[in-house]
Every structure is written in C-alpha cells, then in structure tokens.
Amino acid sequence: IDQFDDANNGTTISARRFAQALKNHGNEVRVIATGKPADYKYAVRQMRFFPVVEHLITSQGMRLAVPNRHVFEKAAAWADVVHFMMPSPLGIMGLKHVEKLGIPHTAAFHCQPENITFTLHMGNSRRVNDFVYNRFRDTFFNRFTHIHCPSNMIANQLRQHGYTARLHVISNGISPEHIYGKREKEPWMQGLFNVLMVGRYAGEKRQDELIDACAKSR
C-alpha cells in the first residue's frame, strides 16, 4: 500500500485493520509503504507532483509511492502471499514481479473510480466512470483470482463491469472504541435524532445528499 502511517483515508484504515487481524490470527505481516522504515515496513519514497496534482491527491488523504523494484523484490522474497490494496504505480510494478516469480497474490478494491472522477468534477459522468472501471479491470484486477470487496455494492459494481475474479465481501469493520454504548440522552436532546456522517469531506461521499435529506425530514 502506498500510505500506511496516517489513517486519514478509508484504504489506509482498512489496510491497518486487515494487517492487525492477520497478526491476531498468528500471521506475520509486513508492508511496503511511504514513510519511516520500521520492523514491519519496507519504506519507499513518496512521489512528488506539480502543485495542482499534488493537491488533488492529498485532498483525498493519500500519498503515492515511487515504485522501487529492489525494495519490492526484497519484500516479495520474504512473503508467502502478497496482497495489493490499490492499482497504483507501486501496485502495478509489484504485480508484474509476483506474476513473474509465481508468488501467490490477492487484491482489494478500495479505490473506486468515483474517488478520482468526483475530484476532477466528472463524477456524474457514467462514461468516464465506466472507462476507469474498465482500465482498472484490464490492466490490474483481472490478473487476480481473488478480490476483497468492502461492501456488496462494490462487488456488484465489479460484476457489472466484467471483473472475473472471485469476489469476497468483507466489511472494513468498526474500531472497538466506536461500538455503541447505550446511555440516556441529555435533556436538551430528548425527542431528537442524532445523524452522524462518517467519511472524508469529498464529493463522492455525497454529504450534500445527507444535508438535503435532513432538510426534508420530519
């Protein structure tokens, strides 16, 4: 994964929870990512772009890694299975390597085309979204036999766009600190509903729909 240290986006949060769950089941997990080196991490440099492009990427809470074949070969030689989180330049380079060496590999689908197209103000264009889905499919995901989907909605989208891998729907999960603990409402909240929106402040998250719904609620 390109970014593992800062949990400011859903892909990174999912990767960290996935890694922890594997560790809890007795597996050893290492990651390739930007940031500082660690016992569990093979560090690679962060890509730099022109200011406008840099802003578009960081506004999504993401950083992209510079593909480093030497570092990836070192990590892949240690691993029994390599799991890919995104069709990023690092992921595409790594996929070619594991295919060449015959190392078992799986993928997750966390980067929806809408994450990209809404940032470019083209999120409502079905043609553009379909183009990105198809590019992801043909250049990356149809080279896997198993894909982790965080929701049924994602799995359905992949089926509709001709993805051929076996799809496994597994929720990203909820941290224990966010588990609902029932308590009495404060007096000023009696008779009112609490509506919570969780997610980045980004176009594809459609906070505008929630605001419109609240305005029309009774």
Over which residues does each language-model region extend?
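Carbohydrate-associated surface elements
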Residues: 35, 153, 173
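N-terminal subdomain of nucleotide-sugar transferases
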Residues: 1-38, 77, 215
